[in-house]
UniProtKB/Swiss-Prot annotation:
Family: Belongs to the mycobacterial PPE family.
Subcellular location: Cell membrane
Superkingdom of the source species: Bacteria
Record-annotated membrane-spanning stretches: 14-34, 180-200
Pfam families: Pentapeptide_2 (PF01469), PPE (PF00823)
Record key words, sorted: Cell membrane, Membrane, Transmembrane, Transmembrane helix
Membrane topology: Multi-pass membrane protein
PANTHER family hit by this protein: GLUTAMINE-RICH PROTEIN 2
GO cellular component: plasma membrane
Protein name: Uncharacterized PPE family protein PPE21
Organism annotation: Mycobacterium tuberculosis (strain ATCC 25618 / H37Rv)
Signal peptide: none
GO biological process entries: response to host immune response
């Protein structure tokens, strides 16, 4: 175990949660007693056999008995010396433990430090607590270093104690009989406390281990003819799938060449649906990525039969249209041919109205440029709106060309802009920044989802590229509240932190199951790798509630792993039900247990990742201001609700370092903003 990568929450808990030095002291006392008993037995046995050999029992039988008895007496004497050495080494182990315990930071101090950090982060809306947060983090790093030093020292001393022990030699009678491990079905089976290492399959023709099925070259499969590992299904080349004929890993469905899909025959990753060529689609028959709908050619569309990106509607050809059957960019309405039109049936650019032919007309049924009114033919002003700088603007307060919305800096926008520091091109959304956005308050390119930051996101409050699920941080995610790439799970619960997961609430990659900590698990609530069973701690288990390797049986226990409070947990020191990973706990007197977490040191319910506080979070160090409650957050170091991205504080946000509500982009302190530095 690499203690240097474990935080003080785990290292301190490992030292303080055990039984302490008492059992080892008892063992030292027992070894001392055994040494005395063996020494007395050796002396007594030698005296008795000597009296027999020098007395009435003479002849060849007596001589043979004397030789065997002498050998056994020597073994008793040697065993007594070895028992005395074991007693001394047990006492040395006690001394090493007590020294390490004294050098380890108390878990209460670690918990108080983390509680102080959460309080500072929750109240740091204006950044005023930054120095205090830095100081708390510095103390935490010192705790981490102290625990690592203590554990490494303890490991070194304990290893030296173990290496100095002399192995016990078998007795003469035992040496004459065959020994070794128990053999079951031709494979070894060991029992190491609550750790089991199985090696048998519950069917025939398997090359791998721990399979519930036949003819599997891989291991821990529930099914047949799987070349990969931990699949529930048949004929999978990849690992961690629920389904059949998958070439990739972590799929829920059939015939997927890639990974993390929920559906059938997807050529790409992170899709929910079937027959998609691309990634992160929520729908079927899409040629592209990040679409919500069917038969789209392009990215970030919400609707059907769109060619292009960032459209909200159906049968659009272009970018950033809100409506149907538009040919162009940034139109709001239907059947427009051109860009930046606010209305329907327009041919041209920047018209505010319907059935206009031309540029910058404000009205209906006009033919010409800059006309204000209806049913006119001719040429009006350069701009038909007021306060414009440019040409062909029918809205107000624009700088640029062919804008039918207001306050835009750019070209061909039918939505309203944000103002300074934001530039819009071909956008139909309100207060968006970028190109071809039909989603309100979006920053980037081709976003049809609201409050998104990035490229071609068709769902709300996402940060990244080609996400069709809501509140994702990353790329090609069709599920909700995921932090990572190509995750299709998370709808109605919480997403995952990792890569290509089709299940929900996973911390890891290629998991088709849910609430796992690790990789390639098709079962649920596992801590480890390649498990097709449920609630296992270890590797390649197709049974349930196992702690170990290659087990295909179900164990009659409440948890797998160690030091849990509750039931159906895997891993280490979780309190509650259906948790995997390490030290997931409520730490709240009003909520003793937590449910459905994966990862490390999460506080709340249905969290995936590391040190999240609240409910329904994925990522690293995210929190909700009230400590408890539904957050719906993905990403890193966010505080609030419905947030994706990095270092955001508020609600309904995406992007980086924003500090108010309903914001996308970067470094914004105003509400209802997109872009940069508002």
């Amino acid at each position: 175990m690499n203690f240097s990568v474990l935080p003080p929450e785990i290292n301190s808990a490992l030292m303080f949660a055990g039984a302490g030095p008492g059992p080892m002291l008892a063992a030292a006392s027992a070894w001392t007693g055994l040494a005395g008993d063996l020494g007395s037995a050796a002396a007594s046995f030698s005296a008795v056999t000597s009296q027999l050999a020098t007395g009435s029992w003479q002849g060849p039988a007596s001589a043979a008995m004397t030789g065997v008895a002498a050998s056994y007496a020597r073994w008793l004497t040697t065993a007594a010396a070895q028992a005395e050495q074991a007693a001394g080494q047990a006492q040395a182990a006690v001394s090493a433990f007590e020294a390490a315990l004294a050098a380890t930071v108390h878990p209460g101090a670690v918990s108080a430090n983390r509680g102080r950090l959460r309080s500072l982060v929750a109240s740091n809306l204006l950044g005023q607590n930054a120095p205090a947060i830095a100081a708390v983090e510095a103390v935490y790093e010192q705790m981490w270093a102290a625990d690592v030093a203590a554990m490494l020292g303890y490991h070194g001393e304990a290893s030296a104690v173990a290496l100095s022990l002399t192995p016990f030699t078998p007795s003469p009678s035992a040496a004459a009989t065959p020994g070794g491990a128990v053999i079951i079905a031709g494979f070894p089976f060991l029992d190491l406390g609550n750790v089991t290492i199985g090696g048998f399959n519950l069917a025939s023709g398997n090359l791998g281990l721990g399979n519930l099925g036949s003819f599997n070259p891989g291991s821990a499969n529930t099914g047949s003819v799987n070349l990969g590992n931990a699949n529930i299904g048949d004929l999978n080349l990849g690992s961690g799938n629920i389904g059949s004929y998958n070439l990739g890993g972590g799929n829920t469905g059939d015939l997927n060449p890639d990974s993390g899909n929920t559906g059938t025959l997807n050529w790409g990753s992170g899709n929910i649906g079937s027959y998609n060529l691309g990634g992160g689609n929520l729908g079927s028959y899409n040629l592209g990525s990040g679409n919500t709908g069917d038969t789209n050619f392009g990215g970030g569309n919400t609707g059907n039969l769109n060619v292009g990106g960032g459209n909200t509607g159906n049968s659009n050809f272009g970018f950033g249209n809100t409506g149907n059957v538009n040919f162009g960019n940034g139109n709001t309405g239907d059947t427009n041919f051109g860009s930046g039109n606010l209305g329907s049936g327009n041919i041209g650019f920047g018209n505010k109205g319907s059935h206009n032919i031309g540029f910058g007309n404000s009205g209906n049924n006009n033919i010409g440029f800059g006309l204000t009114g209806d049913n006119q033919i001719g040429f009006g002003a350069l701009n038909s709106g007021s306060g414009n700088l440019g040409f062909g603007n029918s809205g107000n307060g624009n700088i640029g060309f062919f804008n039918s919305g207001n306050n835009n800096i750019g070209m061909g926008n039918s939505g309203n802009g944000v103002g300074a520091l934001s530039v819009e091109f071909g956008s139909s959304a309100e207060r968006s920044s970028g190109f071809g956005n039909s989603g309100e308050l979006s920053t980037g390119i081709g976003n049809s989802g609201q409050l998104s930051t990035g490229w071609f996101n068709s769902a709300t409050t996402s940060t990244g590229w080609f996400n069709s699920g809501t509140t994702n941080t990353g790329w090609f995610n069709s599920g909700t509240t995921n932090t990572g790439i190509g995750n299709s799970g998370g709808n109605l619960v919480t997403g995952s932190m990792g890569l290509f997961n089709s299940g929900h609430t996973n911390t890891g990659s290629f998991n088709a199951g849910s609430m796992n900590t690790g990789d390639f698990n098709s079962g649920n609530v596992n801590t480890g790798y390649f498990n097709s069973g449920n609630i296992n701690t270890g590797f390649f288990n197709s049974g349930d509630l196992n702690t170990g390797l290659f087990n295909s049986v179900n164990q009659p226990v409440q948890n797998s792993g160690w030091l849990h409070t509750g039931t159906n947990n895997s891993g280490y020191a979780n309190a509650g039900t259906f948790n995997s990973g390490f030290d997931n706990n409520a730490r709240d007197e009003h909520a003793e247990f937590v449910t459905g977490n994966s990862g490390l040191a999460n506080v709340g319910n249905y969290n995936a990742g590391i040190i999240n506080v609240g409910d329904h979070l994925s990522g690293f160090r995210n929190s909700v201001p009230t400590i408890t409650g539904t957050a719906n957050i993905s990403g890193f170091v966010n505080a609030g609700t419905s947030i994706s991205g990095f270092f955001n504080f508020g609600s309904l946000m995406s992007g980086f370092a924003n500090f108010d509500d309903e914001v996308s982009g970067y470094l914004n302190g105003d509400s209802r903003a997109s872009g940069w530095i508002h």
